[in-house]
Amino acid sequence: MGWKYLLSDIEIAQQCKMKKITEIAASLDITPDELELYGSYKAKLADSLEKRLADKPNGKLILVTAINPTPAGEGKTTTTVGLGQAMPKIGKKAVIALREPSLGPVFGVKGGAAGGGYSQVVPMEDINLHFTGDFHAITSANNLLCAMIDNHIQQGNALDIDTRRIIFKRCLDMNDRALRNIIIGLGGQTNGVPREDHFMITVASEVMAILCLANDIDDLKERLGNVIFGYSRKGTPLYARDLKAVGAMAALLKDAIKPNLVQTLENTPCFIHGGPFANIAHGCNSVRATKLSLKMADYVITEAGFGSDLGAEKFFDIKCRYAGLTPNTVVLVATVRALKYNGGVKKEDTTIPNVAALKAGMVNLEAHIQNLQTFGVPVVVAINRFSTDTDEELAVLKEFCTAQGAEFAISEVFAKGGEGGVELAKKVVASCEKPQKFQCLYELNTPIKEKINALATRIYGADGVVYSPAADAAIKDIDALGRSNLPICMAKTQYSLSDDPNKLGRPKNFVINAATVRLCNGAGFIVVETGDIMTLPGLPAVPAACSIDVNNDGYISGLF
């Protein structure tokens, strides 16, 4: 596949000839007064655009998801971008809708999250770092509420807040394990009331979820007001609106709620907006960006985080349910190396040809195909090809996918850009014409434990669910509040269908361990934290940050 592999992602991105964002906007019939420019290559979209396009018909909605990944990831965003670049090559107008990267994994493991090779969104450095400031605004709004909680306690505590039952956490957009559990208010009376507190990463914040699910400012304010931040000493739930925090929080978010427009290396328009993780949050870009993109293109390609057991399930059961969206096709990204890994091969040996291990690991692919078919949407399996994949291995995969009732395409968009995704694009377009009977996994009025059990048994393959005393108590509290009719957002490891990252393939004879359950009343879902999941990750032994630098001319290196 040639010399192109010698260039890093950031080198490829820096050599790209970007068009001015006004040109990209013009290709979508967006007028200059409907753009809010952030330099020459980034823009936010004005609210007036949404109103102008309200009556236009929607294009086709394509979701890109994946099997359970190796720690390196399997190229889901790369495939999403590459497919978007391939669509114009077969005469189709396409828009891509992605999440914004978090600084946590950028400086932790990934080193960047804007696609890879010749299928990237640009300006890559800006997107991976501060971008248009959305995450800063979300972090600020979240922490404003936290500051107002502790200030209220300090100023006399008229709401009788029980400091042992404050459930709303501070956040920051960084991997920093030292802040998971802290004591605040030390240093005497003038420095606040001492209590235990916690940080989570911004992408797991309820404010992030609210921004991504809100339709407009009024909806945003209503959801912010419904946030339950804690309980009084009598056990009464306390809301953000009780602190009169909603107006100021919404003011901080007034620009962040507007979708961002950028482009790919091949100038395909891309909306990047919102960024909840799929393992500890609902894992989808904003409803506003998705709905807006559907008014502008024949095909909208979006992605949901990690494997289909996490991101895709939440896309269907949370995002599509709330937004009234109907997906036309799902692209399931898999790699030969990940299937070998799921077949028991060590990570460092996955590039060695091994058909037996591939076949052993295909049970994981089988589970994901069957899970997606449960939702009634046609499936196209996209094999993200690596140079070490053999023809024999690819032939085995094609035969297997066909037997499962799924379409199959080889994707080479990393090395070839849109040209490497033409086969996939043709399969996806044809798949979008197939009849689909989209349905969610469960009805909202089903009891909480039955909804959790449906996810555990039908999607993960578990025998059942074991609840901690704390989880049981939380479910009773949610029932008592009359909020049991909300969708479930499972917080679970991305590396396994189970809640144990070491159980690869298609595990059998296991249970899901529900450690904690919490109500995200403003976002409108119930989070179930399983296993040892952390809502504030830590950095690895050698963080990606160690390789990132900037020279005197402002050129950044080390983002990959």
Curated annotation (Swiss-Prot):
Its EC number is 6.3.4.3. SUPFAM superfamilies: P-loop containing nucleoside triphosphate hydrolases (SSF52540). It catalyses: (6S)-5,6,7,8-tetrahydrofolate + formate + ATP = (6R)-10-formyltetrahydrofolate + ADP + phosphate. Transmembrane segments: none annotated. The keyword Ribosomal protein does not apply. GO terms for biological process: tetrahydrofolate interconversion. Keywords: ATP-binding, Ligase, Nucleotide-binding, One-carbon metabolism. ATP binds at T70, P71, A72, G73, E74, G75, K76, T77. Pfam families: FTHFS (PF01268). InterPro entries: Formate_THF_ligase, Formate_THF_ligase_CS, P-loop_NTPase. It comes from the Archaea. Pathway: One-carbon metabolism; tetrahydrofolate interconversion. GO terms for molecular function: ATP binding; formate-tetrahydrofolate ligase activity. Belongs to the formate--tetrahydrofolate ligase family. This is Formate--tetrahydrofolate ligase.
